[in-house]
C-alpha cells in the first residue's frame, strides 16, 4: 500500500462533534448506544455507517445495495431503520471531507501501526468444527486488509469480517472470523496489511496437541498404578483382619 497516499477521514468531523458534546468517559449509564457512526474517506470513496450498543454492532447500512444489514436477523424483526438516513449522513460527511481536505492542503492522516491477536472461539478439539478470531486493534486510518492463510495458502471460504468499531481514542478495531476444522496437519496465519506497517504482519496459530508419552513414561505410570493398587489391597486386608479380631474379642457368653 502506498504510504504517501493522501487520506483525510470524515471521521475527523465526527471526532470534533463528540469532543464538543463530551467524551465517552463523561457518560455514566448502564448501557450506551452509539448511533450513526459515519466514516468516509478518500481517495477510494469508501464509507461506513453503523449503529452500536454497548460496543457491539447492531446494524450497518450497505452503501452499495442501499439497504440495512442487521447483525442478527431477529433485530430486524424488533426494529427498523431506513437506509436513506445513513446515505444522507454519508453524503454530508463526504461534503465535509472535501472542505477539510482543502483547508488542510491535502495533508495525509497519520498512520498508526495496528496490533493483531489470534485465538479460537471455543476450546480446540481435533476434528470438531470451530472458529478462529483475528482481533485487530489500534487501526488508524480505518483502511486495512485482513487475510487468512492455511499452510501458507490464502483461504476465502468460511471467512467473515465485521465493520470498523470506534475506540475511545477514536482509533478503530475490527474482527475477522474463519470457520475451520482443527487438524494436526494444518497451521493458520492471520495476515494484516496497513499503511502504518512497513510490511505485512503474520499472526500464527496452530492447535496445541499434547506430546505423546514415551515408553519409559508409560512404564513408570503403569508401575505406579500397580503399586498403588497393591498397597490398597494390603491396607484393606489389614483393616478387615483387625475388624474381625475386634469383633471376636467383644463377644461374651450370655446367662444360662
Curated annotation (Swiss-Prot):
Residues 112-205 are annotated as: Alpha-2. Its main location: membrane. GO terms for molecular function: peptide antigen binding. The keyword Transport does not apply. Keywords: Adaptive immunity, Disulfide bond, Glycoprotein, Immunity, Membrane, MHC II, Signal, Transmembrane, Transmembrane helix. The chain crosses the membrane at residues 219-244. Residues 24-218 are extracellular. Residues 245-256 are cytoplasmic. This is H-2 class II histocompatibility antigen, A-B alpha chain.
Amino acid at each position: 500500500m502506498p504510504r504517501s497516499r493522501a487520506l483525510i477521514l470524515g471521521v475527523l468531523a465526527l471526532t470534533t462533534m463528540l469532543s464538543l458534546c463530551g467524551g465517552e468517559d463523561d457518560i455514566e449509564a448502564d448501557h450506551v448506544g452509539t448511533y450513526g457512526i459515519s466514516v468516509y474517506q478518500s481517495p477510494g470513496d469508501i464509507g461506513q455507517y453503523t449503529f452500536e450498543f454497548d460496543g457491539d454492532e447492531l446494524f450497518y447500512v450497505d452503501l452499495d445495495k442501499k439497504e440495512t444489514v442487521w447483525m442478527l436477523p431477529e433485530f430486524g424483526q424488533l426494529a427498523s431503520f431506513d437506509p436513506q438516513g445513513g446515505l444522507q449522513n454519508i453524503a454530508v460527511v463526504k461534503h465535509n471531507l472535501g472542505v477539510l481536505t482543502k483547508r488542510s492542503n491535502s495533508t495525509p492522516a497519520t498512520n498508526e501501526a495496528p496490533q493483531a491477536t489470534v485465538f479460537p472461539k471455543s476450546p480446540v478439539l481435533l476434528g470438531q468444527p470451530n472458529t478462529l478470531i483475528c482481533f485487530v486493534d489500534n487501526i488508524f486510518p480505518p483502511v486495512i486488509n485482513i487475510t487468512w492463510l492455511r499452510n501458507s495458502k490464502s483461504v476465502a471460504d468460511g471467512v467473515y469480517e465485521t465493520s470498523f468499531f470506534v475506540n475511545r481514542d477514536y482509533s478503530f478495531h475490527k474482527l475477522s472470523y474463519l470457520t475451520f476444522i482443527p487438524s494436526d496437519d494444518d497451521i493458520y496465519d492471520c495476515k494484516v496489511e496497513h499503511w502504518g506497517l512497513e510490511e505485512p504482519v503474520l499472526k500464527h496459530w496452530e492447535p496445541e496437541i499434547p506430546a505423546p508419552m514415551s515408553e519409559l513414561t508409560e512404564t513408570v505410570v503403569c508401575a505406579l498404578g500397580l503399586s498403588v493398587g497393591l498397597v490398597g489391597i494390603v491396607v484393606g486386608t489389614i483393616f478387615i483382619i483387625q475388624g474381625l479380631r475386634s469383633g471376636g474379642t467383644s463377644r461374651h457368653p450370655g446367662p444360662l
